[in-house]
Regions:
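Glycine-rich active-site/cofactor-binding loop and its immediate structural neighborhood
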Residues: 288
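Short, solvent-exposed loop/turn segments at secondary-structure boundaries
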Residues: 67-69, 101-104
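Conserved catalytic cysteine-centered active-site region
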Residues: 84-91
Length: 328
């Protein structure tokens, strides 16, 4: 039995510039961190006495006699991609709900590949895991996804990612533990109660990207990455500026697509801001999932009270990325 443990991520700035339609022409950039919320995947060879070849347990249970019968698209594509001839039992457990803007779909793809490679006795690099996850999602499954989530899941930590046509870079953000802890202590996360398929939200945005009608907005969003880095790396700068920039980024992001926000989500944001948040954003493509807010510690109880009808999720940063935590 193999167990992989793969983190999800919080993206601060640059989202939308990690789609090939944009970065292959203009270049993209993202500032993000992985957090201590994980997807756990166990894989093992099917017992020879079983009356099925594949058993996959997630929000539902699949038992299949052929690969083609598997309905979970990533599981089917990953097994096919790796050309694994024998049967498999796969169990998936997640700390947080799926389809909520934290990159969990790509964390799953990366974690599954990692576990399957370990089962076959192969050690693979973080770079290979990320690249193969991107290949599975973008090429084999033809999903409308970017590249930041796969890289975050594989590498882990607080990173500045740079995207070019033939080059995806992951650069660790070099700041002191104290500065990193200061950022972490000012962040709060709340679940809106809404989940959604990012591909549906992204249809309008991707079309606008292809039509080049949001180039100015995407350039502004990309430029915020450098601004965010400057705030983090210059200890003379007030960390609250990071929150102000988050607010600026969220206002800009909402112009990319009419599906990113709605009245319900706008009301949540307004409540948090009125209670003391300096800025925030809806994670991922938008339309639901998790809000992250930048809130000075002395104001956090007030924000908590204002959003008492939502579930708060406490979290911390993590530095490891995907890893194998059990082999037997």
């Amino acid at each position: 039995m193999i167990i992989s443990k793969t983190p999800v991520r919080v993206s601060f700035f640059g989202g939308g510039t990690d789609y090939p339609d944009y970065f292959k022409i203009y270049g993209g950039s993202v500032l993000s961190t992985t957090i201590d919320k994980y997807i756990y995947i166990t894989v093992m060879k099917t017992n020879v006495f079983s009356d099925f070849k594949y058993r996959i347990s997630y929000s539902r249970l699949e038992t299949c006699k052929t690969l083609e019968e598997i309905e979970h698209p990533v599981v089917r594509a990953a097994i096919q991609h790796m050309n694994i001839p024998y049967g498999l039992e796969i169990n998936i457990i997640s700390d947080l709900p799926a389809r909520t803007g934290i990159g969990s779909s790509s964390s799953f793809t990366v974690g599954l590949l990692h576990a399957l490679y370990a089962l076959t006795g192969k050690m693979v690099s973080k770079k290979q895991l990320a690249e193969e996850a991107i290949y599975i999602e973008q090429v084999l499954l033809q999903e409308r996804v970017g590249v930041q989530d796969q890289l975050a899941a594989a590498y882990g930590s607080l990173n500045h990612m740079i995207f070019r046509e033939n080059n995806l870079q992951v650069n660790p953000v070099i700041i002191s533990k104290e500065r990193k802890k200061l950022l972490e202590s000012n962040l709060m996360m709340f679940y809106t109660g809404l989940s959604r398929y990012a591909s549906v939200i992204l249809e309008e945005q991707v079309k606008k990207t292809q039509d080049k009608t949001i180039n100015t907005e995407l350039k502004d969003i990309r430029d915020m990455v450098d601004e965010g880095l400057s705030i983090l790396c210059d200890t003379d700068k007030d960390i609250n500026q990071f929150g102000t920039l988050l607010h600026k980024g969220w206002m800009k992001k909402k112009t990319l697509s009419s599906a990113i926000s709605n009245n319900f989500l706008d009301e949540i944001y307004e409540k948090a801001m009125n209670a003391g948040a300096i800025g925030g954003k809806l994670l991922g493509a938008g339309g639901g999932g998790f809000f992250v807010f930048f809130v000075p510690p002395q104001k956090q109880d007030e924000v908590r009270a204002a959003l008492s009808d939502l579930n708060e999720v406490g979290f911390g940063f993590e530095d490891d990325g995907t890893r194998i935590i059990h082999i037997s």
